[in-house]
């Protein structure tokens, strides 16, 4: 099991090809190739995890299952910082059955294609920093994860300002996406899903 504190932001990506060129020009290296991820968030019937701003997620990617718990985010207007614990799971279907027996239900499912990059030469104090490109049914986003100073520098180098920072979850972004289009939000899934 891995436990850590994560600090991250999302940035909107209006032009996927342009942002890929920019990432290459900034000397990032691809550490995890583009892959499909299927994510399921769990909660109790009374939505106590959502109410307390915690997340319990089961992810399937590259034929592996990963269970993640995220604690409530610290108070910050610019960054989302929270404790994160995660562990690989041998059998995600069996874990799903266990979670249901404990009273947890599927609260939200979402798909994305994800590509993970790291700085070729990390700046001092930014070891482990990551730039992630997520392609979702509700739009494309960059996630910058690392120290706040690294996030700010990297966002600026990519052409973004602090006003562009997003700390909302994919569930919240999808609700907003649906509401703006007069649709009832459900799960955020591609019409054709693939591993």
Predicted regions and their residues:
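N-terminal strand-loop-strand beta-hairpin
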Residues: 1-128, 160, 164-195
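Short, well-ordered alpha-helical microsegments
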Residues: 16, 151-152
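A short beta-strand motif that forms part of the nucleic acid-binding face
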Residues: 71, 137, 148
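A contiguous pocket-lining binding segment that forms or flanks enzyme active sites
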Residues: 131-138
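A hydrophobic, small-residue-rich beta->alpha segment in the mid-to-C-terminal subdomain
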Residues: 149, 155-163
